[in-house]
Amino acid sequence: MKKLFFLCLGLTATAATTAPVEGWLHMRGPLQTGVSLEKRLQDKIQIEDALWTVDLPGRSTPTVANGRIFIVGHLGEGADLQEGVFCLDADTGEKLWEHKFNDFLSDIIYTRYASSSPTIDPETGNLFYQGTQGLFASFTPDGKMLWQHSLMEALGRMTFPNGRTATPVVDRDLVITRGIMANWGSQGPPWDRFYGFDKKTGELVWAAKPGGRPKDSCFSSPALGWLDGKRVFYATTGDGSVVCANARTGEAIWQVPLFKAGINASV
């Protein structure tokens, strides 16, 4: 049975062109730390109090910037299945733009695990999206595509049923994502790999495999932090480890094996 995701928000919005970029910019919040900066929030939210609702199937976390809401969802079934990025007006729920892409993997089941969520760059307001079909792309706040990569074709990203895709993170000039990859040459054999792309051009800056050979899928999202004055990210991996890696190079700083199977929970 198809389940619907009901997006219900009551927000006071500012114009989409307002600078600086402010809002809930990442799945883990405005600073990508899992901490909200908001004060005096309501203890309870009732569906009856919603200013508007939008029916959109999906398991993405909405992100918000300058009066606009960005979310990933899916439409259609079977051969007509599409995944898309949608932009809504935060005041009214009106759809401002959308980009839909064919999800040619017929075994995707969106109602089980989490899918990737949009990430917003705090500097430019641009949006980053990794799709279940292997697309990794950047859009302006107005919906213009800036660059795109087919990670399956370019890097051999493997896919798994149920959506299993990580949410990208932004560190200054880089946007970082990950996946289980299997390819030729330097990108083979199958491994849990992380990639740093230039956020403005989409150029690949570094590729790294800070964990061991994967025993299972892993779609946790990296968490940024600082260690001894260096920008790092913490992540779980497909070999059952927790790793700390240099966010500027992807090089592992430490690795702690914990389990005999992949860990899908984010740090």
List where the protein language model places each region.
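Sec-dependent N-terminal signal peptides
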Residues: K3-T12
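Noncatalytic, solvent-exposed loop/strand surfaces
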Residues: A16-V267
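A general lysine-centric signal
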Residues: K2-K3, K199
